[in-house]
Amino acid sequence: QPVKLTITSPVKVEDVFIKPTLEGATFDLTVKNHSGKKNQFDLYTDIVDKETGSVLYSSLSLQKLVLNADEEKMFTYSVNGLKPRLWTPHHPNLYDFRFRLVTAKGAELDCLSETSGFRTFEVKEGLFFLNGNRYWLRGGNHIPFALAPNDLNLANTFMQLMKVGNIDVTRTHTTPWNKLWMGAADKNGIGVSFEGTWPWLMIH
Protein backbone atom coordinates (compact mmCIF):
# COMPACT_ATOMS: atom_id res chain seq x y z
CA GLN A 1 0.00 0.00 0.00
CA PRO A 2 1.20 3.56 -0.71
CA VAL A 3 2.48 5.46 2.31
CA LYS A 4 2.90 9.22 2.74
CA LEU A 5 4.40 11.37 5.48
CA THR A 6 2.56 14.60 6.28
CA ILE A 7 4.11 17.34 8.40
CA THR A 8 1.63 19.84 9.81
CA SER A 9 1.21 22.25 12.65
CA PRO A 10 -0.31 20.81 15.86
CA VAL A 11 -3.74 22.14 14.79
CA LYS A 12 -4.77 19.97 11.85
CA VAL A 13 -7.78 19.34 9.62
CA GLU A 14 -8.29 15.60 10.08
CA ASP A 15 -11.16 15.01 7.66
CA VAL A 16 -14.04 16.59 5.77
CA PHE A 17 -17.37 15.21 4.57
CA ILE A 18 -18.81 17.21 1.66
CA LYS A 19 -22.59 16.99 1.16
CA PRO A 20 -23.32 18.82 -2.11
CA THR A 21 -26.53 20.38 -3.37
CA LEU A 22 -27.24 22.02 -6.72
CA GLU A 23 -26.46 25.48 -5.33
CA GLY A 24 -23.88 24.82 -2.62
CA ALA A 25 -22.83 22.30 -0.01
CA THR A 26 -22.79 21.44 3.67
CA PHE A 27 -19.45 20.52 5.23
CA ASP A 28 -18.62 18.41 8.27
CA LEU A 29 -15.03 19.42 9.04
CA THR A 30 -13.11 17.56 11.74
CA VAL A 31 -10.22 19.46 13.33
CA LYS A 32 -7.87 18.26 16.06
CA ASN A 33 -5.55 20.22 18.30
CA HIS A 34 -2.56 17.94 18.89
CA SER A 35 -0.79 20.49 21.09
CA GLY A 36 -0.84 20.83 24.84
CA LYS A 37 -2.41 24.28 24.86
CA LYS A 38 -5.63 25.97 23.75
CA ASN A 39 -5.74 27.30 20.17
CA GLN A 40 -8.02 29.79 18.41
CA PHE A 41 -8.34 30.14 14.64
CA ASP A 42 -10.61 31.11 11.75
CA LEU A 43 -11.80 28.81 8.96
CA TYR A 44 -11.70 29.87 5.30
CA THR A 45 -13.23 27.96 2.40
CA ASP A 46 -12.12 28.17 -1.24
CA ILE A 47 -13.88 26.39 -4.11
CA VAL A 48 -11.97 26.40 -7.41
CA ASP A 49 -13.00 24.92 -10.77
CA LYS A 50 -10.52 22.10 -11.40
CA GLU A 51 -10.62 22.51 -15.18
CA THR A 52 -10.62 26.29 -15.62
CA GLY A 53 -9.02 27.45 -12.37
CA SER A 54 -11.78 30.02 -11.85
CA VAL A 55 -12.76 30.71 -8.25
CA LEU A 56 -16.38 29.82 -7.55
CA TYR A 57 -16.24 30.79 -3.89
CA SER A 58 -13.67 32.13 -1.43
CA SER A 59 -14.62 33.48 1.97
CA LEU A 60 -14.24 33.37 5.72
CA SER A 61 -16.63 30.65 6.89
CA LEU A 62 -16.29 30.44 10.68
CA GLN A 63 -14.61 32.85 13.09
CA LYS A 64 -12.86 32.48 16.43
CA LEU A 65 -13.05 28.70 16.68
CA VAL A 66 -11.43 27.34 19.82
CA LEU A 67 -9.98 23.92 20.59
CA ASN A 68 -8.63 23.00 24.00
CA ALA A 69 -5.45 20.98 24.40
CA ASP A 70 -5.70 17.58 22.66
CA GLU A 71 -9.33 18.28 21.71
CA GLU A 72 -10.97 17.10 18.47
CA LYS A 73 -14.19 18.66 17.23
CA MET A 74 -16.44 18.58 14.18
CA PHE A 75 -17.58 21.92 12.75
CA THR A 76 -20.63 21.91 10.46
CA TYR A 77 -21.51 24.79 8.15
CA SER A 78 -23.06 25.45 4.74
CA VAL A 79 -22.36 27.52 1.64
CA ASN A 80 -25.37 28.40 -0.52
CA GLY A 81 -26.38 30.57 -3.46
CA LEU A 82 -23.68 29.30 -5.81
CA LYS A 83 -24.02 28.55 -9.53
CA PRO A 84 -21.59 25.69 -10.09
CA ARG A 85 -21.12 23.55 -13.16
CA LEU A 86 -22.87 20.35 -12.09
CA TRP A 87 -21.32 16.89 -12.26
CA THR A 88 -22.92 14.34 -14.61
CA PRO A 89 -21.47 11.26 -16.33
CA HIS A 90 -21.35 13.19 -19.62
CA HIS A 91 -19.95 16.35 -18.05
CA PRO A 92 -17.91 15.32 -14.98
CA ASN A 93 -17.23 18.84 -13.71
CA LEU A 94 -15.06 18.84 -10.59
CA TYR A 95 -13.94 21.43 -8.06
CA ASP A 96 -11.07 21.65 -5.60
CA PHE A 97 -12.44 22.41 -2.12
CA ARG A 98 -9.80 23.98 0.14
CA PHE A 99 -10.26 24.37 3.89
CA ARG A 100 -7.76 26.71 5.57
CA LEU A 101 -7.18 27.25 9.28
CA VAL A 102 -5.77 30.73 9.88
CA THR A 103 -4.73 32.51 13.08
CA ALA A 104 -5.87 36.02 13.98
CA LYS A 105 -2.45 37.29 12.82
CA GLY A 106 -2.90 35.69 9.39
CA ALA A 107 -0.64 32.66 9.80
CA GLU A 108 -1.96 29.52 8.10
CA LEU A 109 -2.03 26.58 10.49
CA ASP A 110 -3.22 23.92 8.06
CA CYS A 111 -4.92 23.47 4.70
CA LEU A 112 -6.80 20.44 3.40
CA SER A 113 -7.77 20.14 -0.27
CA GLU A 114 -10.35 17.66 -1.57
CA THR A 115 -11.72 17.21 -5.09
CA SER A 116 -15.47 16.76 -5.46
CA GLY A 117 -18.41 17.80 -7.60
CA PHE A 118 -21.83 19.35 -7.19
CA ARG A 119 -24.50 16.70 -7.76
CA THR A 120 -27.55 15.16 -6.15
CA PHE A 121 -28.93 11.65 -6.62
CA GLU A 122 -32.24 10.53 -5.15
CA VAL A 123 -35.18 8.17 -5.60
CA LYS A 124 -38.68 9.62 -5.99
CA GLU A 125 -41.88 7.85 -7.01
CA GLY A 126 -39.89 4.72 -7.88
CA LEU A 127 -37.57 6.60 -10.25
CA PHE A 128 -33.96 7.77 -10.05
CA PHE A 129 -33.16 11.48 -10.30
CA LEU A 130 -29.73 12.94 -11.00
CA ASN A 131 -29.50 16.68 -10.26
CA GLY A 132 -33.29 16.86 -10.17
CA ASN A 133 -33.74 15.23 -13.59
CA ARG A 134 -35.07 11.74 -14.25
CA TYR A 135 -32.15 9.42 -14.93
CA TRP A 136 -32.09 5.94 -16.45
CA LEU A 137 -29.22 3.87 -15.08
CA ARG A 138 -26.89 2.31 -17.63
CA GLY A 139 -24.54 0.19 -15.60
CA GLY A 140 -22.17 -2.74 -15.54
CA ASN A 141 -20.95 -5.17 -12.91
CA HIS A 142 -17.90 -4.63 -10.73
CA ILE A 143 -14.60 -3.72 -12.40
CA PRO A 144 -10.98 -4.77 -11.61
CA PHE A 145 -10.27 -2.60 -8.58
CA ALA A 146 -9.30 -5.58 -6.42
CA LEU A 147 -6.70 -6.72 -8.98
CA ALA A 148 -4.71 -3.48 -8.89
CA PRO A 149 -6.00 -1.01 -6.29
CA ASN A 150 -3.01 1.33 -6.73
CA ASP A 151 -2.87 1.38 -10.55
CA LEU A 152 -4.21 4.76 -11.71
CA ASN A 153 -3.52 3.94 -15.36
CA LEU A 154 -5.68 0.81 -15.16
CA ALA A 155 -8.47 2.73 -13.42
CA ASN A 156 -8.54 5.49 -16.05
CA THR A 157 -8.16 3.12 -19.01
CA PHE A 158 -10.89 0.74 -17.89
CA MET A 159 -13.35 3.54 -17.12
CA GLN A 160 -12.69 5.19 -20.48
CA LEU A 161 -13.46 1.86 -22.15
CA MET A 162 -16.69 1.76 -20.16
CA LYS A 163 -17.64 5.16 -21.56
CA VAL A 164 -16.95 3.97 -25.11
CA GLY A 165 -19.38 1.12 -24.42
CA ASN A 166 -22.04 3.54 -23.11
CA ILE A 167 -21.67 2.29 -19.53
CA ASP A 168 -21.93 5.10 -16.99
CA VAL A 169 -22.42 3.26 -13.68
CA THR A 170 -20.76 0.37 -11.85
CA ARG A 171 -20.67 -1.05 -8.32
CA THR A 172 -18.06 -1.90 -5.73
CA HIS A 173 -17.59 -5.56 -4.83
CA THR A 174 -15.81 -7.51 -2.08
CA THR A 175 -14.10 -4.44 -0.67
CA PRO A 176 -14.75 -0.68 -0.74
CA TRP A 177 -12.80 1.30 -3.32
CA ASN A 178 -9.89 3.46 -2.23
CA LYS A 179 -9.41 7.16 -2.92
CA LEU A 180 -7.48 6.53 -6.15
CA TRP A 181 -10.30 4.60 -7.84
CA MET A 182 -13.05 6.87 -6.50
CA GLY A 183 -11.13 9.86 -7.83
CA ALA A 184 -10.80 8.21 -11.24
CA ALA A 185 -14.56 7.56 -11.27
CA ASP A 186 -15.25 11.23 -10.54
CA LYS A 187 -12.84 12.36 -13.25
CA ASN A 188 -14.10 9.96 -15.93
CA GLY A 189 -17.81 10.42 -15.23
CA ILE A 190 -18.56 7.01 -13.74
CA GLY A 191 -21.30 6.63 -11.14
CA VAL A 192 -20.61 4.13 -8.35
CA SER A 193 -23.02 2.07 -6.26
CA PHE A 194 -20.93 1.86 -3.10
CA GLU A 195 -21.69 -1.53 -1.53
CA GLY A 196 -20.59 -2.90 1.80
CA THR A 197 -18.28 -5.85 2.28
CA TRP A 198 -21.22 -8.26 2.77
CA PRO A 199 -24.10 -6.70 0.78
CA TRP A 200 -26.12 -9.87 0.33
CA LEU A 201 -26.30 -11.14 3.92
CA MET A 202 -29.60 -9.44 4.77
CA ILE A 203 -31.54 -10.37 1.64
CA HIS A 204 -33.50 -13.05 3.48
List where the protein language model places each region:
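Active-site-adjacent "subsite" loops/lids of carbohydrate-active enzymes
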Residues: R138, P199-H204
